[in-house]
Amino acid sequence: MNAAVIDSKNSQDFVVADMSLADWGRKELNIAETEMPGLVQTREEYKAQQPLKGARIAGSLHMTIQTGVLIETLTALGADVRWASCNIFSTQDHAAAAIAKAGTPVFAFKGESLDEYWEFSHRIFEWPNGEFANMILDDGGDATLLLILGSKAEKDRSVISKPTNEEEVALYKSIASHLDADPTWYSTRLAHIQGVTEETTTGVHRLYQMEKEGRLPFPAINVNDSVTKSKFDNLYGCRESLVDGIKRATDVMIAGKIAVVAGYGDVGKGCAQSLRGLGATVWVTEIDPICALQAAMEGYRVVTMEYAADKADIFVTATGNYHVIGHDHMKAMRHNAIVCNIGHFDSEIDVASTRQYQWDNIKPQVDHIIFPDGKRVILLAEGRLVNLGCATGHPSFVMSNSFTNQTLAQIELFTQGEKYENKVYVLPKHLDEKVARLHLARIGANLTVLSDDQAGYIGVDKNGPFKPNHYRY
């Protein structure tokens, strides 16, 4: 048993890898704050009002240094918080230790098993003193899914009887165990939730699907589609963190290689830019004719995965879809081709189909898959997020954009929840512009101010918003 789990049995309301890392984590948190002006200024603006006083936030989001600054912003504004990571490999152990030492219950360490992951996802809803979480801050939708699926299983256990992958095996087992102990565990907690703010594309897809089917049990704010999130975190964050992960894992020379990026949304665009910037020849696969045309107009060759599989050196999935790289693709790849994913879930690459072959672990989150003919394919982070599994994720500055949106969304939903139906919303344009404005001074950017005549000429307030909601940045 991991030492961190043993700690949790000694009446300590946290599970981390090593509390001796806390001081190191605190030093990095202090550095990160200097690069996260949006969060720091939001603390200053709202700390006297304490708008989150009474909020009990169940957080499921990568437990990194940057997330630590988010957590301490939420608590500075009055919230009580319990936190787990949304990925088994993404935790930075020194960050988790620092936040736990400061008094926030954290249940996360790098390299969790799937059983531990789902146990920790339950722990964020286990509030002391008979209280319950009333807000969810989610990344990928697992915390939201847990309560909704568990509540459904209370009425019909058959919904957790037929797992289709190892993730579902662990999830269903965990739900069944909790139902055996308390048959109303999930519905009791679900009834207290006022709303969720969702960080990423995959989780947002889940929310919109539930809304469409009339199954969304509480209001949701789609943080991902704030312009200052999707056009910054997804694009510029991935532009820096993808190659950081690949190079830390493999030390490969990117220049001269053929790299395939599956998906040319905001994440794929950032990935393609970074690989081309280091001298790779970049090919793109796409299902959407608009995105495919964008890629072609940027000078990328648009191909199919079937065409590229036996020709390219590096493969990156960035689609949010299922089995974008399948078994036959990997079987066709060159010896020592590098395969990785930067979408939220590990299902973009059909990793399960390769378990029949020999795996040779090179170092943490770097494996050789050895095919029967002796060919090896290098798989990074077991098909999970390469930038967080093999590196430390996005830089602090760009995460300040995303997490300032999260903070404002939590404030809005907690303080104004009665205004919202059980639907998915996005933050209003004036808040999107506010988030951007908070970050300009840090990078030496100075805004031009419209004159009254100029503002009148184009029909906007001189202080914004400057664009209509349908504007595409």
UniProtKB/Swiss-Prot annotation:
One of its GO terms (biological process) is L-homocysteine biosynthetic process. GO terms for molecular function: adenosylhomocysteinase activity. Keywords: Cytoplasm, Hydrolase, NAD, One-carbon metabolism. Binds 1 NAD(+) per subunit. InterPro entries: Adenosylhomocyst_ase-like_sf, Adenosylhomocysteinase-like, Ado_hCys_hydrolase_NAD-bd, NAD(P)-bd_dom_sf, S-Ado-L-homoCys_hydrolase_CS. NAD(+) binds at residues 200-202, 234, 263-268, 286, 321, 342-344, 387. One of its GO terms (cellular component) is cytosol. It is found in: Cytoplasm. It catalyses: S-adenosyl-L-homocysteine + H2O = L-homocysteine + adenosine. Substrate binds at T64, D139, E199, K229, D233. SMART domains: AdoHcyase, AdoHcyase_NAD. Its cofactor is NAD(+). Its EC number is 3.13.2.1. Gene3D superfamilies: Adenosylhomocysteinase-like, NAD(P)-binding Rossmann-like Domain. It is an enzyme of class 3 (hydrolase). Disulfide bonds: none annotated. Pathway: Amino-acid biosynthesis; L-homocysteine biosynthesis; L-homocysteine from S-adenosyl-L-homocysteine: step 1/1. It comes from the Bacteria. Belongs to the adenosylhomocysteinase family. May play a key role in the regulation of the intracellular concentration of adenosylhomocysteine. NCBIfam families: ahcY, PRK05476.2-3. HAMAP family: AdoHcyase. This is Adenosylhomocysteinase. It comes from Paraburkholderia phytofirmans (strain DSM 17436 / LMG 22146 / PsJN).
